[in-house]
Amino acid sequence: MKIAILSRDGTLYSCKRLREAAIQRGHLVEVLDPLSCYMNINPAASSIHYKGRKLPHFDAVIPRIGSAITFYGTAALRQFEMLGSYPLNESVAIARARDKLRSMQLLARQGIDLPVTGIAHSPDDTSDLIDMVGGAPLVVKLVEGTQGIGVVLAETRQAAESVIDAFRGLNAHILVQEYIKEAKGRDIRCLVVGDEVVAAIERRAKEGDFRSNLHRGGAASIACITEREREIALKAARTMALDVAGVDILRAERGPLVMEVNASPGLEGIEKTTGVDIAGKMIRWIERHATPEFCLKTGG
């Protein structure tokens, strides 16, 4: 097959691993910067051009689209879909997952347990918003934040009010969430490929922090997940219509709670921790689904 990887930086670990895994299985691979793609939208002859040339047909496209370029990145992916390329995660699913509020609403509607969460835009009554999630301690987030950026733990009511007031000054959407103290700065990242949790790690926050993101200096170890956690991870990925997802779970006293569903999970931390060839599993999933029947169905 001919496979395109949409990534702004082909030297990143995840992109390199996916390229290597595809080549090892005999596929032709090209890494494309989605921001350098430009499109002819025409009912008779739609096309995608890249750095002065018209791109050929790709059997499959692997999107590695960062949150900062979600709008144009998903537009480029959508054009590949229109031309009959199989997407490892559809553009609409990626856009949906990047919207934290919509994601939580969809997960809650499917009965998937979450931390108690409130969301507001410049709330007039900060006190009521805090009461909505059970009071302090609580976590205050910017809805648009990623990798632990724009996330603050407010240990007292006064601190929570101060943080919310500061975020209000940014004219931003504010997400307020109960703090799961018993998680002790740890969470479980389940990597879902298709209908299987292929790997799971426990991530631990660095000393003095409560955010377990590896990008923030957290540590990781192999996690043994329960059957309930496995079921929740798969259900969360299905709810978001993602074939590949990183599902983050907190272990609370009342049971596992889904924190987030990531549509473009990094592979470095989880592959190096578990030794699982996740990139290879992603390529094999593509091989099973990027079929001629798919191209006929989509018009490619």
UniProtKB/Swiss-Prot annotation:
Its EC number is 6.3.2.-. InterPro entries: ATP-grasp, ATP-grasp_RimK-type, ATP_grasp_subdomain_1, RimK, Rimk_N, Rp_bS6_RimK/Lys_biosynth_LsyX. One of its GO terms (molecular function) is metal ion binding. ATP binds at residues 141, 178-179, 187, 211-213. Disulfide bonds: none annotated. Gene3D superfamilies: 3.40.50.20, ATP-grasp fold, A domain, ATP-grasp fold, B domain. One of its GO terms (biological process) is protein modification process. Mn(2+) 1 binds at residues 248, 260. This is Ribosomal protein bS6--L-glutamate ligase. An L-glutamate ligase that catalyzes the ATP-dependent post-translational addition of glutamate residues to the C-terminus of ribosomal protein bS6 (RpsF). Is also able to catalyze the synthesis of poly-alpha-glutamate in vitro, via ATP hydrolysis from unprotected glutamate as substrate. The number of glutamate residues added to either RpsF or to poly-alpha-glutamate changes with pH.
